[in-house]
A protein has these predicted regions:
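Helix-turn-helix
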Residues: 47-76, 80
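Hydrophobic alpha-helical connector segments
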Residues: 94-129
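Amphipathic alpha-helical packing segments from all-alpha helical-bundle domains
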Residues: 129-132, 143-167, 177
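Amphipathic C-terminal alpha-helical segment
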Residues: 121, 137-147, 175, 179-202, ...
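Helix-loop "lid/cap" segments that line or gate small-molecule binding pockets
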Residues: 114-125, 134-143, 165
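Basic, helix-initiating cap at the start of DNA-binding domains
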Residues: 2-45, 54, 58, 76, ...
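An amphipathic alpha-helix adjacent to DNA-recognition modules
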Residues: 31-36, 71-94, 98
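All-alpha amphipathic helical-bundle segments outside canonical DNA-binding/catalytic cores
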Residues: 167-183, 206-209
């Protein structure tokens, strides 16, 4: 018996889950269909829990090896799902970071506005909301890397370096913990709001107001006074 809680294909280009429909009509080819379905299921079932069989089936692929043919492994599929959004976000952020780095008077708030605006813009599309809901699932390793001062993506490294410079008066262990707080707050709050929108409940704030709210609370957390005693560090 089919699990009624699981998504089901109802047409070639449509997948229904409860009252919501995943539209695949805009996907130009098999690879894009697999990416969109994977993104959708990863957001709801987890990047490690979503079943490859379900991704193939909901993407309309009878060949059980279709996903493996296009991506090779689950890890590569996860990377492809993230990069389809992240590369566009990086392209929006990089020229703004170029301008910021020419200034001597930038603040943490200035940096956060560059980070937050393109992320929050993803709330306006189903695919973007799924992307935001996936980010916290892969953040465990990133938070560990930040504590060690490690970043991988060039744009992320630039952002972290700029934020770190704004926190220069704080001891290094505290600065690194503040950067973890930044990453956890921005990812979890965006993911939570994306899920809230997907629930169908009317939004409390529109995208612009939510972006301003994020910048307010995260800049306050980053720049909060340090009262940790030296003996505790």
């Amino acid at each position: 018996m089919r699990d009624a809680s699981r998504p089901v294909r109802d047409t070639k280009d449509s997948v229904t889950e409860g009252a919501r429909t995943l539209d695949l009509a805009s996907c130009a080819n098999t690879k894009e269909r697999l990416l969109r379905v994977a993104e959708y299921l990863f957001a709801r079932e987890g990047v490690w829990s979503a079943r490859v069989r379900d991704i193939n089936e909901l993407a309309g692929q009878r060949n059980a090896s279709a996903l493996h043919y296009h991506f090779g492994s689950r890890r590569r599929l996860i990377k492809a799902v993230m990069l389809r959004h992240q590369l566009k976000i990086d392209a929006e952020q990089d020229p703004l970071l170029d301008e910021l780095e020419q200034r001597a008077d930038y603040t943490a708030r200035d940096i956060l506005e560059i980070v937050v605006v393109p992320l929050v813009a993803r709330l306006d599309s189903p695919s973007g909301r799924d992307f935001l809901r996936i980010i916290p699932q892969i953040l465990r390793k990133l938070s560990g890397d930040l504590r060690q001062g490690i970043t991988i993506r060039l744009t992320m490294s630039r952002i972290i370096d700029l934020l770190d410079a704004c926190l220069g008066a704080l001891p290094q262990p505290i600065r690194r913990e503040r950067l973890v707080v930044y990453a956890l707050m921005i990812s979890s709050l965006c993911a939570n709001y994306a899920e809230f929108i997907d629930s169908g409940i009317p939004s409390v704030l529109d995208s612009r107001a939510f972006a301003t709210h994020l910048v307010d609370v995260i800049s306050a957390a980053l720049c909060a006074p340090d009262t940790v005693t030296p003996e505790a560090r």
